[in-house]
Amino acid sequence: KVFGRCELAAAMKRHGLDNYRGYSLGNWVCAAKFESNFNSQATNRNTDGSTDYGVLQINSRWWCNDGRTPGSRNLCNIPCSALLSSDITATVNCAKKIVSDGNGMNAWVAWRNRCKGTDVHAWIRGCRL
């Protein structure tokens, strides 16, 4: 599913991401834009053999199990396929674990490069939340 900007913002808010660990909703929407273009079915293979999955491009080396990543830790205890659903519950629950891991949202390269230090509120402007 390719989410609309405000549609994804509303779903993320409903799942408790707004100000989770101090990151406003705009940060999460911005990250999703530049990680997946709001596409829940996005997958991208990495040079180390791992794959990133879903709207927040969660990585199979650490966070989920896709059955083909050597040495996968599966710290979210989920199949990576769960991260491709139009229901973002699994994605949000895993993202909460990732953002609590010590590096905050710096875990997302796209957030670090394209959202951090910018006016992220713009990503939820005009949304009825």
Curated annotation (Swiss-Prot):
EC class name: hydrolase
| Compartments where found | Secreted
Provide the assembly information. Answer: Monomer.
**Swiss-Prot/TrEMBL catalytic activity:** Hydrolysis of (1->4)-beta-linkages between N-acetylmuramic acid and N-acetyl-D-glucosamine residues in a peptidoglycan and between N-acetyl-D-glucosamine residues in chitodextrins
Q: Which residues form the C-type lysozyme domain?
A: 1-129
- Name of the molecule in the record: Lysozyme C
According to its UniProt entry, the protein's GO biological process terms are: defense response to Gram-negative bacterium; defense response to Gram-positive bacterium; killing of cells of another organism
Q: Which CDD domains match?
A: LYZ_C
**Origin species:** Callipepla californica (California quail)
The cross-references to PANTHER family, in alphabetical order and at most eight, read: LYSOZYME C
Predominant subcellular localization, coarse grouping: secreted
